[in-house]
Amino acid sequence: MTAQVDAVILAGGMARRMGGNDKGLVELENRPMIEHAIERIQPQVKEILINANRNQNRYSEFGFKVISDQDTGYLGPLAGMITAMSNTDAEYLLVIPCDCPLLPTDLVARMLAKLTAEDAELAVASDGKREQPVVMLLKPSLRASMKAFLDAGERKIDFWYAKHHYVVAEFSDQPNAFVNVNTPEQKQQLGEAIANEKNY
């Protein structure tokens, strides 16, 4: 039986380096950034959740359940993950950021294969050079551990998952898969990369 996988798209941050603009709604190639992520991930999962702490009505227009952090202090990606784990009954939860428009179309299959082959609790993606902490496949049963970590004042995702049996799913064959947008300059570069991808 195929494992049931839901996804959460993290769009709950402050986006300070983008001038405070809501990153998921910033347009890239004439479409909101999050729309690119949805297009890539929707065929790979059962349900999609969108974690947003502002502009919730706008995000709801994409047709998926919008969830906001249970703690409203903008505590980072971990807070969004904890909220998502409370809103899924799937066997696994895929976590992705809203600003990765070139995600692999085989992301779930490869991460799940790696995780199950090694009987791990979670899988973290890598571009072949470094791990991508906000691209993760994990068991929602890890929620209590993550909440305790956050409640202790910790924020760094990689510190948390290092405490668990995790595996790294490598995507060195797709080196641009996890390129994301933190500044207007990166947005322009990524727009050019997407345009080039369409031309091949």
From Swiss-Prot:
Keyword Phosphoprotein: no
UniProt keyword terms in alphabetical order: Cytoplasm, GTP-binding, Magnesium, Metal-binding, Molybdenum cofactor biosynthesis, Nucleotide-binding, Transferase
GO biological process, one term: bis(molybdopterin guanine dinucleotide)molybdenum biosynthetic process
Residues where GTP binds: 10-12, 23, 51, 69, 99
Domain of life: Bacteria
Keyword Cytoplasm: yes
One GO cellular component, as annotated: cytoplasm
Major enzyme class: transferase
Entry's EC annotation: 2.7.7.77
Chemical reaction(s) catalysed: Mo-molybdopterin + GTP + H(+) = Mo-molybdopterin guanine dinucleotide + diphosphate
Localization in the cell: Cytoplasm
Cofactor(s), by name: Mg(2+)
UniProt: Mg(2+) binding residues: 99
Any one Pfam family match given in the protein's UniProt record, by short name: NTP_transf_3
One GO MF term attached to the UniProt entry: molybdenum cofactor guanylyltransferase activity
Function: Transfers a GMP moiety from GTP to Mo-molybdopterin (Mo-MPT) cofactor (Moco or molybdenum cofactor) to form Mo-molybdopterin guanine dinucleotide (Mo-MGD) cofactor.
Domain notes: The N-terminal domain determines nucleotide recognition and specific binding, while the C-terminal domain determines the specific binding to the target protein.
Sequence similarity: Belongs to the MobA family.
SUBUNIT field: Monomer.
Protein name as catalogued: Molybdenum cofactor guanylyltransferase
Gene symbol of the encoding locus: mobA
